[in-house]
Amino acid sequence: MEETEKMKAFIFDLDGVIVFTDKFHYQAWKKMADRMGIYFDEAINNRLRGVSRAESLEIILEKYEGEPLSAEKKAELMEEKNNTYRELLKTMTAADVTDQVRATLKKLHEAGFKLAIGSSSKNAKFILEKVELLDAFDAISDGNNITHSKPDPEVFLKAGEFLGEKPEDCVVVEDAYAGIDAAKAAEMEAVGIGDASRYEKADYKIQNFEELLKIAGIE
């Protein structure tokens, strides 16, 4: 995408880009793991970033030394984790989104760009409601409408589809390597922020959210 004129839409990962709920994920998984007698630390938690709840559980169960678990039991563990996580999410408020993020999204929207969320989380809408940011996005593609999580491109392709835009006209903003891989697999350009700002596959690398305005040709 050599010309900013081709950019018509921005698709944002949620966690680690718009909001930061890593600590809640960690606390919820750890509570479940501790109860099961499974070793779990922040290094293992880092492997869970950007992947689905089911895949996250399988990673955690690598340390499980008990009898093999049935699909039903695994589903119970995932529900247990999510219930704890949602309780923690209830503490979120509008203050959990920075003024810089809000202002940048507003400027992008006013400049005519369509905005979407592309997240593997099934709690995306709930989180956006809690931080009072649901109305900032034209579409939400999340864990409720996909069958494959990142690095599969499905979540971003669905977001583009919901926006009515072609993949080549969409730019993805991601903080995880798996998310950048998913964006490239979708044939979309990718902006790396946070950890992903060090990933060579990212087309753009930024340190601050407001740098998106330069990429969009607004500032």
PLM region spans:
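Asp-based, Mg2+/Mn2+-dependent phosphohydrolase catalytic module
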Residues: 2-8, 102, 106-107, 121-219
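An amphipathic alpha-helix signature
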Residues: 26, 30, 53-58, 78, ...
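Active-site neighborhood of HAD-like aspartate-dependent phosphohydrolases
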Residues: 2-46
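Short, acidic loop-to-helix structural element flanking the phosphoryl-transfer center
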Residues: 6, 87-117
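Helix-loop "lid/cap" segments that line or gate small-molecule binding pockets
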Residues: 32-33, 54-69, 127, 160
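Conserved SAM-binding loop
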Residues: 18, 97, 117, 148, ...
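Metal-dependent phosphoesterase signature
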Residues: 39, 61-99
